[in-house]
Swiss-Prot record:
GO BP term, pick one: mitotic sister chromatid cohesion
UniProt keyword Zinc, yes or no: no
GO molecular function: DNA binding
Family: Belongs to the timeless family.
Name the record gives this protein: Topoisomerase 1-associated factor 1
Source species: Eremothecium gossypii (strain ATCC 10895 / CBS 109.51 / FGSC 9923 / NRRL Y-1056) (Yeast)
Protein location: Nucleus
InterPro entries: Timeless, Timeless_N
Transmembrane portions of the chain: none
C-alpha cells in the first residue's frame, strides 16, 4: 500500500496539501509508533463519525446519512494512512479500517449515494434546462466527500506484496488483509449492482469534459486514480506471493489457511463477475476512449502504465485461442457444459463448474489407468509379497502382476516411499511478483458466452485502435527512464506484448486482420528493447524476467511466421536483426542453465529454441540466404559462413571437420569500406552446433521426464531437436542411462497412450536411437563403461569418446604481412643477378642488425647453414654443378618468438625469400626450402649472409640500409589469409619514381616540422594578456595530404588489403557563410573592456597583482550591466580616476603607429611582399598604416564569445621568410570579407583578427546530421 502512495506525483499530493499541512501541526508525534489499542480506538471514532444508517427514515432499507464532520473525518483517516502505514511501514491502520468495515459500510454507500444524486441531477437538468449546480444541493461539498472516499477506497484495495524490505508488522497483517481485500472486491462488484464502478467512471468523465489545455495536474491525476481503481479490482485474487528465503517463515502464517474468507466463493470474485460489471457500466468503452486518445487528449505519462496493468490483469488468465473460437464451437472441455455443469446432484455454474469439470476429467484418467494396470479379483489371491530390508524394515507388495513383472513390482515399492517435497529454486523468486504470473499455462477461467463475446469485442477493438499507441508510449517510457523502472513493470510489459501478439496471430490465421494493427510491435525499437531486457536479466540472474522475455520473443517469431507475402521484405529485415551473432550467442546460452529452474521456465526456453530453429531451417530448406550485418569491430563470425561453401545438404554432414569450418573466413564476409559494416550469410549448421551441448541436453531430458504433464505438441518439439542430434553425428550426447530410462517409461504400458500419435513417434525415434547405440558399441566397446557416467568435458578426451578419433590440431587462420619490397637501386641494370642478390642480402641483414634483431639473423644463419651442408652431402660433386631438384626441408626453430617473426616481420620474411625459402601464407602453413636450385647460388647466399653479419655493410648512396626498402605503414595488417602472397607482392603498377618522390616528400615534411618547432616555441613569448592572432585558413595542397602505403596515392592498388577508416565529409552549405553578418556582432562593451585590460597590463608591465584581478572582474561586469557606465570606486585599479575609452584608443593608435613605423624601417625592401591590390607595387607609407579605416571601431567586427576568446586557443602564424602587408580596407564590410578569405595573411602578431564561428556538420554514410 505504501507503494501506491510513493508513486503519487506532485499532482496527487496537491489534492490534499491543505490537510497534510494541518496534520503536521495538530499531530505532535509524526513518526512515533502509536500503541495499537489507541490507534484502533481513534480509527473506530472516525468510522463512527463518518456516517451511518439513518434509522429514523421511514424507508424499509435505512438510507446512509453523512456525519456532520464527514469530510474532516475522511481527511483524518487519510492522514493516518500516510503517517502510520506509509512512513512507518506498518499496516495497522489498514487492519483497523478493515476490522471496523469502513469500506463496506461507509465508503461504498457514500459513492453510491453521490452517483445517485449526480444521475438524478443530470436527468432533472435535462428536463428543466437548469444548470446542474442548481439541481444538486451542495454539489461541490458532496463532490469533495466522494473524491476523498474514492481515494481511500483506492488505497485500501491497492495490491499488496511482500519483499525483503517488508517489516514484521506487514508480514503479520498480510494474510488477514488479503482476505479483507477479497471481501472488498465482492462488496464493490455486488453492492447496489456494482454502482461503485459507475461512480468511478463518472469521476473520470467529469475531468474528460474539461479541455486538455485547461486541465490541471490534479485533473490528470484523477484520471490515473480511476484507472488504478479498475486495476485494483482486476488484481485482487486469492493468489500467493513469493517472499525472500532469508526471512523466517514461522511468523508469516502465509498459505497456512484457506485464502478465501467466509461467505465468499470463487464465483463472487472471478473474472466473469468483473467483466459483467464492466460491461454493465460501460467500462470497456471508457478504456478504449482513454487508450485511443493517448497523446492527443490525455497525457501519456499519467495513463500509459495504468492502462498496461489493466490490460495485463484482464488477459493474464485467458487463453487467446479460446477467445478466437466461435461461439458455436467451444473447446472440447466445455462442450458438455455450456454455462452450466451437472454433477449428478444438481446444477453447478461459473468458475466452480469449470474446476469440477477438470477434476472429473482427472478422475476419469485415473480410473482408466487403474483398470489397465490392476488385476481381477481372483488373481489377487495369494499375490502378496513381503521383503525385509537390511535395517530390519519391511516392504510389502500386493497385486498378482507384481510377481510377473519385476519393473512393476519395483514401481509399486517406489510409490510407497515418502519423498521429500521438491523445493522451488530460490533464484526464481523475485520480490513482489506473484508465483502464478509466470506459470506458462492459462488458468481455468470461466467466462459466460455473453461475457466472452464482450471481452473479445473489447480486445479486438483495443488492438485495432489503441495497441500501437500504447505500445509506443510504453517503449518511450522504458527507454527514457531506466532508473525508476520496477521489475514488475518490465514483466507486465513483456507478458502484455506476448499475449496480444498471440491474440493477433490467431486473428491473422482466420483472416480477420492483416497485421497492420500491431505494426509497432514489429519496429526495431520493440525487439531491441525486449532483447535488452533479456540480456540484462540474464546477466543479473533475474530469472522471471528472462522467462517473460523468452515468451515475448517466441510469440514475435511465431507471429512473423504467419504474416503474408506482403510482409515478406519486412519480415526478412526483422529476422536479420534478431538473428545477429551476438543475439544468437545469447539465445544458445540460456538453455544451458534452464534445467535448474521450474518446468514452466524450461517449457518457455524450449519453445523459444524451437521457434528459432524452425525459422532458420525454413530459410535453409528453401535455399534462401539470411544475410546478417554488423560493425566490423564487433562482428562475431561464429555463425556465419562463406558464400557457396555450405549448402542445405551439409547440415547433416560429418562432424569431424567441424573445427576447421568453424574458423572465421574473413574473405567470406562482404565488407563495406565506406560504412564500416560487414555482412555475411547465416549458417544453420553452425547455429545448431551452438545448441549441441551437454547442459542443453540436460534441459531437454529434464523436460521430457515430465511427459505426463506435456501435450502432444510439446513432445513433438523435443523430438524435433533430438532428431537433429541423431542426424548430425552428435548422437553420443544422448547415450545416457537417464535418457534411456525416460524412453522406457514413455513406452511402458502406463506411459503414453497406446492409440496416440505421440507414442508412434517416440517408438520410431527409439528404434533409430537404439540402432545408433548398437553401432557405437560395436565400433567402440569402451562405451559400455562410458554410458554409465556423465559426459567428459576434457577437450581431447571428450572429442575421442564422441567421434572415435583424435582431435585434429587446427588453428585459426589470421593475416600475415607481405615481405618488404625493394625500391630502385642505383646501377642495378649493370649488375648481374648474383651481385643484385648479394646487395639485397646486405641491405636486409644490415637493416635487421640496426633494428636489434641480430638473434633472429644468427638463428637463420645457423639453420640455413645446416640445410646447405645437408644438400652438399646428399649429392656428388659432379651433380652439384647442375640445376637439380632438392628435397623439402621445413624451417624449425626453438627460439622464442621466431615463429611470430616469420609471420609478422616483413624484413625477416624478405630475407627468407631472398635466401630461397617459401614463407608461410597463413599461420598453419610452415616455412620451408626445397625445389629446383643451382647449388652454387645457395652457397653464395650463405657466404653473403655470413659476410654481412661480420662486416658492416656500406650502401652505395651513403644513407641507411632501410632507405632501399619499401615497407607497409601498418605492419600488423597484411594480406588476406586465403590470398596468394605473390599477388599481393605485385608492384608493376608502382613506378620507382613515385616511390622516391613519396619518400622524399615524407622526409621534407619531417624536417619542415623540426624547423617550425623553433618558431612555435618563440611565438609563446608574448606579453601577458595579449591575444594571439589566427592565421588565415588556406586550402591544403595535394602534396600536404597524407598518401597511401609508402607514399603511394590511395587511388592506386596497395600492397596490403588494409582496412580503411570511414571518411567524414563537411557540408559546403555552411562554410564561411557571411550573409547574416549582423547576427554575429557582439556588444562593444566587451572590446572596450579589452582595451582597459591592455592598459592596466601595460601599466604593471604584464604582472598584475593577484588582488587586482577580482577588482578588474568587478569593473568589467559593472560596465556590462550599466551599458559602459561606472559607478563604483576603482582608484586602486587605475591609480587615479578611470580614463575614458577615447583616451585609451588614441594612446593605442599612437603606440601602434610608431611601433609599425620602426618595423618597416628595419625591414629590407627586398623582403616586402606587397598587396595585390596595389598595381604599382609601391610600399605603403606610415600614414596609410595609421589611417582611420584601420583604426575604425573594432567593435563592429565579428567577435569571439568570452569563452572562446583565449590566447592559448589562437593559432600562431610564423613565417620569418616574408612579411606580407595588407592594404587596409576602406569599410567595415571589406574588413569582414578580408578576415574571412583564405588568402588573407596578416603580418603583426599583436593584431586582433576576429573570426567567424562556423557550424560544422558531420556527414557520415551520406546522411546529414
Amino acid at each position: 500500500m505504501e507503494e501506491m502512495v510513493s508513486q503519487n506525483t506532485e499532482g496527487d499530493k496537491s489534492i490534499d496539501d491543505h490537510w497534510q499541512t494541518e496534520g503536521a501541526e495538530t499531530q505532535p508525534g509524526l513518526h512515533e509508533t502509536f500503541p495499537l489499542g489507541v490507534l484502533k480506538a481513534r480509527v473506530a471514532l472516525l468510522a463512527t463519525a463518518i456516517g451511518g444508517p439513518d434509522h429514523t427514515s421511514e424507508q424499509e432499507a435505512a438510507p446512509y446519512k453523512l456525519g456532520d464532520d464527514c469530510l474532516a473525518c475522511l481527511k483524518d483517516l487519510k492522514r493516518w494512512f500516510v503517517l502510520v502505514d506509509q512512513k512507518q511501514k506498518r499496516w495497522d491502520v489498514a487492519s483497523a479500517a478493515a476490522e471496523f468495515r469502513i469500506l463496506e459500510e461507509d465508503l461504498i454507500p457514500i459513492l453510491v449515494q453521490w452517483e445517485q444524486k449526480m444521475s438524478q441531477g443530470i436527468k432533472q437538468s435535462k428536463v428543466s434546462g437548469l444548470p446542474l449546480s442548481e439541481c444538486i444541493k451542495n454539489k461541490q461539498y458532496h463532490g469533495k466527500i466522494a473524491l476523498n472516499a474514492f481515494q481511500l477506497m483506492v488505497w485500501m484495495t491497492w495490491p499488496m506484496t511482500l519483499n525483503e524490505e517488508s517489516s514484521k508488522n506487514q508480514v503479520h497483517h498480510y494474510s488477514g488483509l488479503k482476505k479483507h481485500q477479497l471481501a472488498y472486491k465482492k462488496a464493490i462488484l455486488q453492492a447496489h449492482g456494482g454502482k461503485v464502478v459507475k461512480a468511478a467512471v463518472r469521476i473520470a468523465t467529469e475531468v474528460i469534459k474539461i479541455d486538455r489545455l485547461d486541465r490541471s495536474v490534479q485533473d490528470n491525476s484523477l484520471i490515473r486514480l480511476v484507472l488504478n481503481f479498475l486495476r485494483n479490482i482486476l488484481a485482487i485474487e486469492p493468489g500467493e506471493v513469493t517472499v525472500s528465503a532469508k526471512q523466517l517463515s514461522k511468523s508469516r502464517n502465509i498459505n497456512t489457511s484457506d485464502m478465501l474468507p467466509p461467505n465468499i466463493s470463487v464465483d463472487d470474485i472471478c473474472l466473469n463477475s468483473v467483466v459483467s460489471v464492466f460491461k454493465k457500466f460501460k467500462v470497456f468503452p471508457f478504456l478504449l476512449t482513454i487508450s485511443s486518445s493517448m497523446g492527443h487528449e490525455f497525457e501519456a505519462e499519467y495513463v500509459c502504465l495504468p492502462l498496461l496493468e489493466v490490460a495485463f490483469y484482464l488477459t493474464k488468465d485467458i487463453d487467446p485461442h479460446l477467445l478466437s473460437l466461435k461461439a458455436d464451437n467451444p473447446p472440447q472441455s466445455l462442450q458438455n457444459c455450456g454455462n452450466k455443469v451437472s454433477n449428478g446432484q444438481g446444477v453447478v455454474s461459473g468458475q466452480l463448474g469449470m474446476e469440477l469439470i477438470h477434476l472429473l476429467d482427472k478422475e476419469r484418467h485415473h480410473k482408466m489407468s487403474q483398470i489397465r494396470s490392476s488385476s481381477t479379483r481372483h488373481s489377487r489371491f495369494g499375490g502378496f509379497f513381503s521383503i525385509q530390508t537390511p535395517n530390519n524394515g519391511r516392504l510389502t507388495i500386493s497385486n498378482g502382476h507384481s510377481a510377473l513383472d519385476h519393473d512393476l513390482a519395483l514401481n509399486n515399492i517406489d510409490k510407497k516411499k515418502k519423498w521429500n517435497k521438491t523445493t522451488r529454486n530460490t533464484a526464481e523468486a523475485v520480490q513482489g511478483i506473484p508465483v502464478g504470473v509466470l506459470n506458462g499455462e492459462f488458468n481455468l477461467t470461466f467466462l459466460s458466452h455473453d461475457n466472452r463475446s464482450c471481452l473479445k469485442w473489447f480486445l479486438a477493438n483495443f488492438v485495432d485502435s489503441s495497441f500501437n499507441i500504447l505500445l509506443k508510449n510504453l517503449i518511450d517510457y522504458f527507454t527514457a527512464d531506466e532508473f525508476n523502472q520496477q521489475i514488475l513493470q518490465k514483466l507486465q510489459f513483456l507478458l502484455f506484448y506476448a499475449w496480444f501478439l498471440k491474440f493477433e496471430r490467431d486473428r491473422c490465421q482466420k483472416g480477420e486482420t492483416d497485421g497492420i494493427f500491431v505494426s509497432e510491435a514489429l519496429q526495431d525499437t520493440s525487439h531491441i528493447l525486449i532483447i535488452k531486457f533479456l540480456r540484462e536479466a540474464h546477466e543479473l540472474k533475474k530469472w522471471p524476467l528472462v522467462h517473460a522475455a523468452m515468451l515475448a520473443i517466441t510469440e514475435l517469431l511465431n507471429y512473423l511466421d504467419v504474416l503474408g507475402e506482403d510482409w515478406e521484405e519486412d519480415v526478412v529485415g526483422i529476422y536479420t536483426k534478431i538473428f545477429s551473432n551476438e543475439r544468437l550467442k545469447l539465445f544458445s546460452t540460456i538453455p544451458r542453465t534452464a534445467s535448474r529452474h521450474s518446468l514452466h521456465y524450461v517449457k518457455a526456453c524450449i519453445n523459444m529454441n524451437h521457434a528459432i530453429m524452425t525459422t532458420l531451417e525454413r530459410f535453409n530448406k528453401n535455399n534462401k540466404d539470411l544475410i546478417i550485418k554488423g560493425f566490423r569491430k564487433r562482428m562475431i563470425t561464429r555463425f556465419i559462413v562463406k558464400e557457396g561453401k555450405t549448402t542445405s545438404g551439409d547440415v547433416n554432414g560429418n562432424k569431424n571437420g567441424q573445427d576447421t569450418t568453424r574458423d572465421a573466413d574473413e574473405d567470406a564476409i562482404s565488407s563495406d569500406e565506406e560504412t564500416n559494416m560487414i555482412s555475411a550469410r547465416l549458417d544453420f549448421k553452425k547455429v545448431l552446433d551452438a545448441y549441441f551441448n551437454g547442459t542443453v541436453i540436460d534441459t531437454y531430458i529434464f523436460y521430457l521426464k515430465h511427459f505426463t504433464e506435456l501435450t502432444e505438441e510439446d513432445i513433438k518439439r523435443v523430438l524435433y531437436f533430438l532428431n537433429h542430434i541423431l542426424c548430425s553425428n552428435e548422437e553420443s550426447f544422448l547415450f545416457r542411462v537417464d535418457f534411456m530410462i525416460v524412453l522406457k517409461e514413455m513406452l511402458a504400458p502406463g506411459g503414453l497412450s497406446v492409440t496416440g500419435h505421440t507414442r508412434i513417434r517416440i517408438n520410431e525415434f527409439s528404434d533409430h536411437f537404439m540402432a545408433k547405440l548398437k553401432r557405437k558399441l560395436e565400433k567402440s566397446p569402451f562405451w559400455y563403461i562410458n554410458i554409465l557416467f556423465p559426459n567428459l568435458h576434457d577437450r581431447e578426451l571428450g572429442y575421442y569418446l564422441r567421434y572415435g578419433q583424435q582431435r585434429p590440431n587446427t588453428q585459426s587462420i589470421h593475416k600475415v604481412v607481405a615481405p618488404t619490397m625493394f625500391k630502385h637501386i642505383e646501377g642495378e641494370e649493370n649488375m648481374s643477378e648474383q651481385q643484385l642478390k648479394d646487395l639485397k642480402i646486405g641491405v636486409l641483414v644490415s637493416t635487421l642488425l640496426d633494428d636489434g634483431k641480430n638473434h633472429f639473423v644468427e638463428e637463420i644463419n645457423r639453420i640455413f647453414k645446416l640445410v646447405v651442408e645437408g644438400y652438399e652431402k646428399h649429392y656428388q660433386n659432379n651433380e652439384r654443378s647442375a640445376t637439380l631438384h632438392y628435397p623439402r626441408v621445413d624451417f624449425r626453430s626453438d627460439m622464442f618468438d621466431m615463429k611470430r617473426a616469420l609471420l609478422f616481420d616483413s624484413d625477416l620474411r624478405a630475407l627468407m625469400t631472398t635466401l630461397g625459402y617459401h614463407v608461410a601464407d597463413t599461420e598453419v602453413e610452415p616455412c620451408y626450402i626445397g625445389g629446383i636450385f643451382y647449388f652454387p647460388d645457395l652457397s653464395s647466399a650463405l657466404n653473403s649472409l655470413e659476410q654481412y653479419m661480420a662486416i658492416p655493410f656500406h650502401t652505395p648512396n651513403g644513407l641507411p640500409s632501410s632507405s632501399y626498402l619499401l615497407r607497409s605503414i601498418d605492419y600488423k595488417s597484411g594480406v588476406d589469409a586465403d590470398a596468394k602472397v605473390g599477388e599481393a607482392m605485385r608492384i608493376d603498377q608502382f613506378s620507382d619514381e613515385m616511390a622516391d618522390m613519396a619518400l622524399s616528400e615524407n622526409a621534407n615534411r619531417y624536417f619542415e616540422d623540426l624547423n617550425r618547432m623553433e618558431e612555435r616555441l618563440e611565438g609563446k613569448q608574448i606579453p601577458r594578456g595579449t591575444a594571439k592572432k589566427r592565421s588565415a585558413i588556406k586550402p591544403k595542397s595535394r602534396k600536404s595530404q597524407p598518401t597511401g602505403i609508402g607514399g603511394i596515392d590511395d587511388d592506386t592498388p596497395v600492397i596490403n588489403k588494409s582496412k580503411r577508416k570511414k571518411q567524414l565529409f563537411l557540408s559546403n552549405e555552411f562554410i564561411m557563410d557571411s550573409d547574416d553578418e549582423e547576427e554575429l556582432v557582439a556588444s562593444p562593451i566587451f572590446y572596450e573592456n579589452e582595451i582597459y585590460l591592455r592598459f592596466i597590463l601595460n601599466k604593471y608591465q604584464g604582472n598584475l597583482p593577484s588582488h587586482l584581478f577580482s577588482v578588474f572582474s568587478r569593473f568589467a561586469n559593472e560596465r556590462g550591466r550599466m551599458a559602459g557606465a561606472v559607478v563604483g570606486d576603482y582608484t586602486d585599479l587605475f591609480n587615479g580616476p578611470v580614463p575614458s575609452i577615447e583616451e585609451l584608443k588614441s594612446m593605442e593608435n599612437s603606440t601602434t603607429h610608431h611601433g609599425l613605423k620602426e618595423i618597416l624601417q628595419l625591414q629590407p625592401r627586398d623582403h616586402l611582399s606587397l598587396s595585390p591590390n596595389n598595381e604599382n607595387n609601391s610600399a605603403h607609407s606610415s600614414e596609410n598604416l595609421s589611417s582611420d579605416s584601420e583604426n575604425d571601431n573594432i567593435t563592429n567586427d565579428i567577435p569571439l564569445s568570452d569563452s572562446e576568446y583565449n590566447s592559448s586557443n589562437s593559432s600562431q602564424y610564423a613565417n620569418t621568410a616574408k612579411t606580407s602587408i595588407i592594404d587596409p580596407p576602406s569599410s567595415k564590410t571589406s574588413l569582414l570579407k578580408l578576415a574571412l578569405t583564405h588568402e588573407a595573411d596578416v603580418e603583426s602578431e599583436d593584431d586582433f583578427i576576429p573570426r567567424k564561428r562556423a557550424r560544422k556538420v558531420r556527414l557520415e554514410d551520406g546522411e546529414e546530421y
